[in-house]
Amino acid sequence: MAKESIIFVGLFTAILSAAILLVSCAGNDQSLSQYVKIKVQDGDTLWSLADHVAEKKHINKEDFIEWVTENNHLQTADIKPGDELILPVKKKHPAVYQLAIVN
């Protein structure tokens, strides 16, 4: 009987852990859906995006780059045309947004 109890507790713990992990991952994706997503254009860099957004939204440039890197799972600060990035700018309307960068 003790062996069955140990197996039950182990399975219950594994299932509960998996459920918590799934909920936390889904919650993160859902929370990011409130932010603007852009498509990187020729000449865009994280710093040029930071300059553009920081000026209008009063965001610290270093904090902007850290947020974008972390929430877009970037390994480096290198971005290329066609990449899609989520920016720390909340959507005002559920419409599609495109950020135009003037170089």
From Swiss-Prot:
Biological-process GO terms, alphabetical:
division septum assembly; DNA repair; negative regulation of cell division; SOS response
Per the annotation, which location comes first and is thus the protein's main one?
A: cytoplasm
Q: Does the keyword Cytoplasm apply?
A: yes
Entries under SMART domains matching the protein: LysM (SM00257)
Q: Which InterPro entries match?
A: Cell_div_suppressor_YneA (IPR022887), LysM_dom (IPR018392), LysM_dom_sf (IPR036779)
Q: Any keyword Secreted?
A: no
Coiled-coil blocks: none
Keywords, A to Z, come to: Cell cycle, Cell division, Cytoplasm, DNA damage, DNA repair, Septation, SOS response
Q: Where in the cell is it found?
A: Cytoplasm
Q: Which GO terms describe its cellular component?
A: cytoplasm
Give start and end of each LysM domain.
36-87
Annotated function: Inhibits cell division during the SOS response. Affects a later stage of the cell division protein assembly, after the assembly of the Z ring, by probably suppressing recruitment of FtsL and/or DivIC to the division machinery.
Family named by the database record: Belongs to the YneA family.
Q: Write the protein's name.
A: Cell division suppressor protein YneA
Q: Which gene encodes it?
A: yneA
